């Protein structure tokens, strides 16, 4: 005969790991070629000059230089674009 009532079970109690998305290098920061600038889903921030786009929409620097973000209007919407201003040799 049990001396304690059985505790109920729950189907909850789990959580997935965070995706760690977002801006990794901000405007004015110096970067090296290959540095990740933005991790994102979809093209929230667009690639500008000297910036490449990965298959998961990750933006990365193609050259050494300084990060520069800009806003521009496209089809009556304000969009964001990121460029790398190359470092002077």
Curated annotation (Swiss-Prot):
SUPFAM superfamilies: Ribosomal L27 protein-like
Organism annotation: Maridesulfovibrio salexigens (strain ATCC 14822 / DSM 2638 / NCIMB 8403 / VKM B-1763) (Desulfovibrio salexigens)
HAMAP family: Ribosomal_bL27
GO molecular function annotation: structural constituent of ribosome
UniProt-listed InterPro entries: Ribosomal_bL27 (IPR001684)
Region (Disordered): 1-26
Keywords: Ribonucleoprotein, Ribosomal protein
Pfam families for this protein: Ribosomal_L27 (PF01016)
NCBIfam families attached to this UniProt entry: L27 (TIGR00062)
Entry keyword Manganese: no
Cellular component, GO, one term: cytosolic large ribosomal subunit
Protein name: Large ribosomal subunit protein bL27
Gene3D superfamilies according to UniProt: 2.40.50.100
The UniProt record lists the keyword Ribosomal protein: yes
Disulfide linkage: none
Record gene name: rpmA
Gene Ontology annotations of biological process type: translation
Family note: Belongs to the bacterial ribosomal protein bL27 family.
């Amino acid at each position: 005969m049990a001396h304690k009532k059985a505790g109920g079970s729950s189907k909850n109690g789990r959580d997935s790991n965070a995706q760690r998305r977002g801006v990794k290098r901000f405007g004015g920061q110096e970067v090296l070629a290959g540095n990740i600038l933005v991790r994102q889903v979809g093209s929230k921030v667009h690639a500008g000059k000297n910036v490449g786009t990965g298959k998961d929409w990750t933006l990365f620097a193609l050259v050494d230089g300084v990060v520069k973000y800009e806003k521009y209007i496209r089809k009556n919407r304000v969009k964001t674009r990121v460029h790398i201003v190359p470092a002077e040799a």
